[in-house]
């Protein structure tokens, strides 16, 4: 168990490289399985654009910290590993914060303090402790990319649902927040829609997250039943 409250996820001894990514993306999803990083998940996702920006920033931090901590795993003594990991995470987050302030200033103003708070994100520290200290650099990078992609997907879906219900748009202000190249993402889903106020308020985030959690449970159960049925058919054929 991580000191940050993140569950120490057991990993198989051997995996095909892409399995490190896919298992982190779905099986150990940061928000839907480990229930970590709920503060930005609920607070930032008023629009899909905000969710995408926060997700990409977190993904960058996860990939870089996983790579750095994994490369130092044989040189960090157990007595000081937590301060060292927090220092590495803080350094990477500071660089990410400065980069977003320089090149995505409008998005930086919207996300504000939540970028700096990635330092305290239990998903980052917990994964560094439970995975990166035990695995080589390449699997750690793939794991970080999978964790970040899964987290980004959840933020975008929650933000997209709330934005559509709240204002009838999708990825609004993407060109101003992310850059002019993202103008094509801006969609008016429901023209002249007055919106549902609850959707853009904090309770709306909890409600949408609850539906996503339920949907994942249903999908996982159906997949398990399908695998069990297939296994039973193979046994009969043998």
UniProtKB/Swiss-Prot annotation:
It is a multi-pass membrane protein. It is an enzyme of class 7 (translocase). GO terms for cellular component: plasma membrane. It comes from the Bacteria. The keyword Transcription regulation does not apply. The keyword Electron transport applies. Signal peptide: none annotated. InterPro entries: NqrDE/RnfAE (IPR003667), RnfE (IPR010968). Pfam families: Rnf-Nqr. It is found in: Cell inner membrane. Its EC number is 7.-.-.-. One of its GO terms (biological process) is electron transport chain. Part of a membrane-bound complex that couples electron transfer with translocation of ions across the membrane. Belongs to the NqrDE/RnfAE family. This is Ion-translocating oxidoreductase complex subunit E. It comes from Azotobacter vinelandii (strain DJ / ATCC BAA-1303). The gene is rnfE.
